[in-house]
């Protein structure tokens, strides 16, 4: 994935946009591997409440600082599940007139998709399991695990 992204963005002015909090570890690893000229920015957007399912309501709690007009934007997300959050986000970002807008996800759950959106770059396609670790959490916990694992849902 890293090599393909570097090739796709060679010679371009790129904004690498991290979606907080879950994508931080993936974002850090990805940014170190990319060989193109880039700036980093951060956004916090969520459709999850305190549980494991989307609330259906997308909320921005921290907007990005950089202008993306005429720039190539790569959204870095931990996981694409229903797609509602990223669909909402891409619609917002398109109004800011970027030169291009693409999505890189560490994990993709296509069987959970509720809207017509797909990532441009995917680390791993996974089944419909609730996963934690490497930035992914359950109620704010387990983000620091150095791996991705399936959470036992019996107690959830």
Question: What does each model-identified segment do?
Answer:
Residues 3-156:
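PRPP-associated nucleotide enzymes
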């Amino acid at each position: 994935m890293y090599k393909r992204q570097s090739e796709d963005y060679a010679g371009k002015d790129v904004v690498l946009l991290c979606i907080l909090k879950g994508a931080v570890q993936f974002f850090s690893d990805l940014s170190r591997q990319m060989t193109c000229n880039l700036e980093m920015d951060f956004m916090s957007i969520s459709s999850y409440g305190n549980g494991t399912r989307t609330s259906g309501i997308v909320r921005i709690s921290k907007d990005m600082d950089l202008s993306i007009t005429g720039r190539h934007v790569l959204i870095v997300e931990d996981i694409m599940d229903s797609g509602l959050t990223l669909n909402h986000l891409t619609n917002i970002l398109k109004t800011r007139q970027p030169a291009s807008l693409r999505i890189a996800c560490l994990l993709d759950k296509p069987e959970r998709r509720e809207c017509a959106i797909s990532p441009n770059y995917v680390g791993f396609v996974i089944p419909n399991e609730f996963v934690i670790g490497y930035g992914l959490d359950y109620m704010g916990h387990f983000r620091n695990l150095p791996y991705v694992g399936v959470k036992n849902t019996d107690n959830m």
